[in-house]
Amino acid sequence: MINIGIDVGKFKHCATVLDDSTGEVLIKPFFLTNNRKGFDLLYSKTKQFIHRKHSVGMEDTGHYMINLTNYLLDKKFTVKYINPRATCLRRKGLGISAKNDRKDALLIAEMLSEKRFWRSISVRSIENSKFRDITRLYHQLQEQQNQDMNRLQRALDIVFPEANSLSWTRYSKAYMKFLSTYPSASSIALEDIRILRKALKTEGRGRQCKVTAEEIRELAKNSVGEDIISIDLEVTSIIAIINTREEQIRMLEKKIEEFSHKLNSPIISIPGISHISGMTILAEIGDINQFQNTGNLISFAGMDPLVYQSGKYDAAHMPISKHGSRYMRKALYQAVFTVCKYSPTFHDYYTKKRNQGKSHRCAQGHCARKLLRVIYKLLSTNSLYDQNHIQ
């Protein structure tokens, strides 16, 4: 086996070639730039190994290896990603205090010898990673949206704290439109009542605002809110950002749902799994065949409980490892909430754990691991969810 280890960087990479059977370094570590010229240099030095049993290894971290991976796959190389935590622990285990690109490239090449440290990358994996970027972007925008909504409420608590006591739906179109025009109590109190009535009118049937102009102006006149122009500007700016981002979120939702219908994955057959949650989990998993069993998948999601035992001491109530993708864990917890609602098996399992004295969050974690076992079975056998076959 010929092992080609590459330590990836932003502007340059370091590569080396190792004969796994003898441990001989066939090509000493050399540097290549992160551009076409550098990629061609790597190919010219390693193309002699394409038709032999070989592996090209890189750490699965960052995004600097994506272009190089695509290039190598086009050239018919066998590419593998190595767990960066494993290389870090191996370096410490060997007592290597020095760290540089050359030593890292050699270490990566050596670690290709052990299957437990790497996963194979194919063209399909790259295509899946592109969809994963879409689902991650969706969740990132949702998180930013929640943060900006909290910022908006903070600002309103200063300039018009009574606003949320009114009977309108918070963050609705009427709510956002009105506040973008009148961001403070002082701006409302001085406005003509007829103009306020017009501002509260919304287009479309069944969307009339329940708040009256008289009601809101009376509150504004007696408001304890401060008249601060900088906060007024902050309110209008945040509302504009929220509205723009909402359009982007809706567009991504549509794209994800279209892809979900096109893919028609068995994961959507699970009661309570939405297109968004299902596709997020699926995008993070990638190729199910890279996992030998459900334990590997649970560990990949960071849902495996930590264990600490030494001699007679055995730590209890240990948390989950939280290794791997936080997006996958978030989607799992969101999905398991509705799955427990619509699936009798999961509902009974959740109730069982609660009756055992488990907290709500702990019981959810047990259900999430059970959900991962079900997902593994459905994806590996390409079968639909059947309530009668779930134990």
Language model: regions and residue ranges:
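A detector of single, family-specific signature residues
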Residues: M1-Q391
